[in-house]
């Protein structure tokens, strides 16, 4: 049972949840990661738009952190270098959570959505974007390197090969 496993799980992590019946935890994980993949693309788009508009990205980042545009990718795991210490974007996108793992989770989320006839247009688009990014040889980069896709020719950051 969950209660008997909880002490062991607490050794492995600090946020332990009981999501429901068998399999619900996996479902919750892919729902969370679908939202994360979508929001990382959105954060990347917003910051790269600021760059193209010649607005100081650090200023936009500060504004977004304290405004309605805040999200986990903005406040905790920014997709562009120089915005926060200790994140993969400041380490040539060496993975914390790889693009390949994000692509796998997005694919699983879309398969589950299709199975239960859930409408997930943003999840489907994020899945396509990450799948293409991985097929281009980026599956072992951090998932925040997706900023390279939306940045186009304005993206001029160093990435680990």
Residue ranges and their predicted role:
Residues 1-37:
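Rossmann-fold dinucleotide-binding core
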Residues 10, 159-161:
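ATP-dependent carboxylate/acyl-activation modules
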Residues 24-153, 157:
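Helical "substrate-binding/catalytic lid" subdomain
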């Amino acid at each position: 049972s969950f209660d008997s496993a909880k002490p062991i799980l607490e050794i492995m992590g600090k946020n332990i949840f009981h999501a429901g019946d068998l399999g619900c935890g996996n479902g919750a994980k892919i729902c969370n990661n679908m939202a994360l993949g979508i929001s990382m693309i959105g954060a990347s788009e917003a910051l790269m738009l600021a760059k193209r508009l010649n607005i100081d990205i650090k200023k936009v980042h500060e504004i977004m952190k304290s405004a309605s545009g805040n999200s986990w990718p903005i406040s905790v795991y920014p997709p562009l270098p120089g915005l926060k210490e200790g994140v993969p974007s400041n380490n040539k996108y060496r993975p914390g959570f790889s693009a390949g793992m994000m692509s796998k989770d997005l694919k699983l989320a879309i398969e589950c959505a299709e199975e239960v006839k859930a409408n997930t247009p943003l999840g489907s688009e994020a899945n396509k974007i990450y799948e293409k990014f991985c097929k281009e040889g980026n599956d072992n980069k951090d998932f925040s390197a997706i900023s390279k896709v939306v940045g186009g020719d304005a993206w001029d950051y160093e990435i680990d090969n």
